[in-house]
Amino acid sequence: MEITSAVVYKPQLQTALEKKTADVFCKNLKKRSGVSLLQSKTSGKISIEFYKEDSCSEEVKALFDGITVPGKEGFRIRVIDNPDGSGRIVVLGKDERGEFYGMARLLRKAIVKKGSIEIPDELDSLSMTPQYPLRGHQLGYRDKNNTYGAWSKKEFEAYIEDLALFGANAIELLPPKTDDRLYSALFPEDPMELMCEVSKIIHSYGMDVWLWYPNVGRDYHDFGCIDREMEERRRVFSAIPYLDAMLVPLGDPGSLWPTDAMCLTEHFVEILHEYHPEAGVWVAPQHFQPEPGWYDTFYEEIAKEPDWITGVCFAPWEQDSIEELYEKLPEKYRENIRNYPDISHNSNCQFPVENWDMAFALTSGREGYNARPEKMKAIHNMLEPYTIGSITYSEGIHDDVNKILWADQDFDSSVTAEETMADYANLFIDSETSEQVAEFLMDVEHNWDGPVLENDGIDVLYESFTAFDKTVSKQVKNNYRYQMLKLRILTDYWTKQKYAKDQELEQQARAVLDLADITGSEAVIREARTILNLSRDVPAAEDVLFEMLKLADSLRNLCGIQLTENHHGGQCWIRGAYLQTRSMPLNDYQYLMQSFKRIEKMQNEKNRCAALHQLNLRQDPGDGNQFCAPGTYEGFSHVSVWHSWEEDPGYLKTPFIDHSVYTMVGLLHEIDGWYHEFPMPLTWALNVTVLYGTPLEMTFTGLDPEASYGMKVFYPNSFFRAFVGQTALKDETLVNIRAGKVLLADRIAQNPNGKSVRREIEAGREPFWEYDLPKESYQDGTLKVRWEVYDTLKALAVSEVWIMKKE
């Protein structure tokens, strides 16, 4: 039905939210079409009408006879197109929220052009009820995230409205003093004042206000610290005008034993209820590396069913799967599990990108634009049946697509990802191009499938999008959601070009090193350096990179996202400022450059040439030996995989390809010439990782049963702990390491083989943890090595394994 000349009918009695419902409808359509719909207390020839069941007339109710009555927050729609040209579009909400969501459904499906608005007849007789009662997102005003810290109340309200249009009914805020840094240079407003104002905005949309409030005092054994924390909470709870619920993470962040955490939190909740007596409280048993008994104690405490706890949260960095959490909880809390999914990060997170190529990990980083509609729907539909719904964890606007997808699935999990993306493109970008944009949003997820150089879809999508981009309007080009999609497509294409070039440059440089005996060490080092520096001096796909940087500037102005550190004010590249890595070579640049420095200091030319030759043989173990980098696609084939991604997308119970963030930081800053002044092979940043005591097992075939072998292993986490001086017993990883059935060791000592990591590095030796392999472990020519972490369940990562014959 064409509604360009329609009247939005205003009943005599409207609540504040009902008035906002009509206002949002008119405002949104004016922005998209340029048409100002009249709001009037008298109906027109074509009327748009919004009601809720408990205050509408019998005449309106009669219009919906025979249409399924919705439940709480649900709605029904009639599209009545009469032959004489008159008509009515009537939204009847079960309640105020339902009325708003019914209006939002009209906006999502409206076909809007300049000067024209049409509501599809297919919406007639639609009845919907939200599937899950909790549907929300966390928007934290803190230095650590990559967008929200640059926002004022205006930006928060605009974004909250967008989220509400896709069914969100809750927003979670972060109080001041809950981040590593209290303030950000980007903050346009005081954190306390903004929190209070945004709570009013949330409430005005009929949504619930949540707080994420960890226990992060410096020392809770100090009564002075407790008093200060009590006073701070009183300051927050008394100031915030609306507060419906609070989530307390118990170990991320936080360092208290569950018994102490529960006791302390109970006192904080008493203060909460002085000011917000109806506020619910959820606790989340999150912990990076729980000590023995931590989870047992948590479940013992929760089994007491304290009245002040409303529910339990399934969150990132929890040891148990959601099924296990559900089974271990008392019945009282099983029906009140809140989900807190990390939709924001790509690696080192709750749901890492499956088998993510190193090239993307080094360029897009943990918080690059990460539209993952198919995977997010699959994860949602696996987890959500155990819950009341979710409030997603977000560190910026880069995960915007995932937010919308997740909330829409919470509203109705039978909706396809394709339909949600079509609505997203239609409502937020452009009706006329929505079908094509939705396809791009679906396709871009697959750019990260498998090895980057083997993914032809990256080039196909780039070519298709580039041609499409030339046809769209200026209004679309200036849309920040469109620009984020464009930037991601360009970034993936540029990454592939850069990776191909940098790998080729490394091969050229290594070929030069093989000529050291002929042309001399000084000459080949000089030439190899020149070749390797072409990665920085002559960037790959420079025209694409230039366009990416222009988009980054535009996005900083349009939505506040900080995509570089120095120019846009981002905190760091692993916190969303991923374009900071644009000059980082995607090859063994750091290893070779630092090796050259050491080789040049050798006094003997023969030794220098031999050392240069050895650089090219580093991953060549020699005849009868084996080298494996299990964090690579080839090396991962040696790893036993216990569960498929579909069974365990969070990798709680199965090994996965991972990337060492801090090694990558070192590789990045090598370009500046100061960070980690020792050679670091790129494979040290690529790991196979297991969490929470999950066994890691690797299989090697082709061993000689009569030969004697030793094994060398590089453990990146243990290495970096030792390198920065964490060598106490508590810093050791307790792990049973077995070859076959034989126990090789029961821990990873902080000093490998009794030698100081720093001294080994200073002496030019690579620090490996070495083990003798008993012949009985490979008597049939096959060796199985198994690692099982116990006691404190730290993550275990392995970067390299060498199986070497003994002399």
Where are the regions a protein language model picked out?
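Structural motif
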Residues: 9-15, 49-56, 92-94, 141, ...
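Catalytic-core regions of glycoside hydrolase
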Residues: 113-115, 169, 181, 185-192, ...
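N-terminal small/glycine-rich loop or linker at the start of catalytic domains
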Residues: 125-147, 210-217
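Catalytic domains of carbohydrate-active enzymes, especially glycoside hydrolases
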Residues: 151-176
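C-terminal non-catalytic alpha-helical accessory regions
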Residues: 394-402, 414-625
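Extracytoplasmic
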Residues: 613-807
